[in-house]
Amino acid sequence: MSGARTRLLHLSDLHVGSREEPRIEPGLAALINRIEPELIIASGDLTHRGRPEQHERAADFLRSLGRPVLAVPGNHDIPYTPIARFTRTFEHFEHQWKTTEPIYHSDQLHVVGLNSVRPWRHQSGGIRQDQLEHAANHLAEAASSALRVVVLHHHLIGAPWRSRKKPVSRRSHVLAALVDAGAELILAGHIHQAAMSERHEFEVVSREVRGTTVAIAPGLGQPRPDRRGEARGMLVYESEPSTLTVHTYIWREDDWGLTAIRRFPRGREPLAPQSTPAAEELSTSGP
């Protein structure tokens, strides 16, 4: 596998319209200038109540960050009034983003967005078979060097202390289909806490060595005081030809702090033993 390094910034659950923190925007802009991501991903719940003005503010904020943005909807991004929820489900989201299942591709990165929101479900979500086929068809078009990424709102794994939120429906089937399609990285949000794992850490897979990393971004919106363990945060992925490194950043009242680093192998080659610093800030140089 050949290819250059690239970086991807993953935000989720902005919940624009609910207790916003005005210092987030300049702090995030400064961090983006340092790490220079190729793409910003927003994995749903951009708004708190799915209102047109909230969608507009969320889109303006994300576009102001000066990088390409790929966004998928979350369960909070559709109307809460019953009639509009079923007749104009994604109208306001699509007014800003054109589609609920966007695609981004370059020589280093190939990203497929999937819409897991179902209007008849208040919290949980699902992915249909035709959506899985859609993802497989697009991932098959990726450059040989590209990191293959799938994004949806509802989680496939979750933090063990937040198990009460249901993951995406038929998650084992969804995961297996995306892995078979070649996804190396599957991103989501929804639970407002960071979680990540390589599929072999939670799933017995016989005679199969393909590595797939599943990651959940902590929410960027206001933490809810009645929910234990929530913090504002985001994830940064640094992809190189043989490795994927995930950096977790948490907002600490007035700035972003690096709190964790995990490193995963890419492709089918086993990762050679190598010492990794416990905490190492991303280089300020670009990819």
Residue ranges and their predicted role:
Residues 1-9, 103-113, 143-147, 209-212, ...:
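Beta-strand-turn-beta hairpins that frame and shape the catalytic cleft
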Residues 144-159:
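Short acidic, glycine-rich surface-loop motifs adjacent to enzyme active sites
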Residues 17-19, 48-53, 57, 75-83, ...:
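Active-site environment of divalent metal-dependent phosphoester hydrolases
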Residues 11-12, 39-45, 69-75, 115, ...:
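Active-site neighborhood of phospho(di)ester-bond hydrolases with catalytic His/Asp-centered motifs
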Residues 164-240:
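Conserved beta-sheet core of the metallophosphoesterase superfamily
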Residues 56-137, 177-179, 208, 236:
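Extended active-site neighborhood of metal-dependent phosphoesterases/phosphodiesterases
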Residues 1-64, 80-81, 99, 134, ...:
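N-terminal active-site segment of His-dependent metallophosphoesterases
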Residues 238-287:
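A short C-terminal boundary segment appended to hydrolase-like catalytic domains
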